[in-house]
Amino acid sequence: MAVGKNKKLSKGKGNKKRAVDPFTRKEWYDIKAPVFFENRNVGKTIVNRSQGLKNASDALKGRILEQSLADLNKDDEQAYRKFQLRVDEVQGRNCLTNFYGMSFTSDKLRSLVRKWQSLIEAHQDIRTTDGYLLRVFAIGFTRRRANQVKKTTYAKSSQIHAIRKKMFEVIQRESSSCDLREFVAKLIPEVMGREIEKSTQGIYPLKDVFIHKVKVLKRPKFDVNKLYELHGGASVVGAEDVGTKIKSGEFKEPVPQASV
């Protein structure tokens, strides 16, 4: 057997490199929701500090954040609605967000499905007045008529087609004549769902009619002034970072002191 050094038994190096906590290189930023939500302080997000050519604001822009409407509007009954917010601008330590979508939680959608009824779904692409292309998804369920004895409430195919056509008409009418801010204002109290329920009474009575999902397919060219309007104006957003201009004639040279 050859005599040699056993590599497995060799001693390791005495000076090991000390592990650096990665959180020492990171910073926390506040997330601000648009003004159409009651609670504008959504939370915080973390990012690596600006270093060299890498800017922290560039890493933050484009982040998609998901928040429950119960936290945004301080209403626990709306916990099943999830709103997506996209970071479009960074001012100081504040991330200014804009609406980027909405969806229902899976447990809420599953709780709506029942036996002995018909499920009717529809989706349509609409364009707001300020250039956003949105895909709106609606859902509804048939219910019993007044004094109905029959257990089932199945709708015929012709009735389902007629109800879906009414859904298209209501979504187009309520969405195409408003901008994104007005659209979200209609989305939160479920204005379109109630309109669909009213307009389809003559075809077949519906219940649990909701706009359960909204996707942003296309956004207009980014305008920072419009984003500031969604956050209460530029002077409100960056109040802590903007100084006051000194007018000419206000500065007075201090009187020199005799002793220090």
From Swiss-Prot:
Keywords, sorted A to Z: Acetylation, Cytoplasm, Ribonucleoprotein, Ribosomal protein
InterPro entries reported for this sequence: Ribosomal_eS1, Ribosomal_eS1_CS, Ribosomal_eS1_euk
Main location: cytoplasm
Entry-linked SMART domains: Ribosomal_S3Ae
Record-listed N-acetylalanine modification sites: 2
GO BP annotations listed: translation
GO molecular function, one term: structural constituent of ribosome
Transmembrane segments: none
Cellular location(s): Cytoplasm
Cellular component annotations (GO), alphabetically ordered: cytosolic small ribosomal subunit
Assembly mode: Component of the small ribosomal subunit. Mature ribosomes consist of a small (40S) and a large (60S) subunit. The 40S subunit contains about 33 different proteins and 1 molecule of RNA (18S). The 60S subunit contains about 49 different proteins and 3 molecules of RNA (25S, 5.8S and 5S).
Entry's family note: Belongs to the eukaryotic ribosomal protein eS1 family.
Protein's UniProt name: Small ribosomal subunit protein eS1
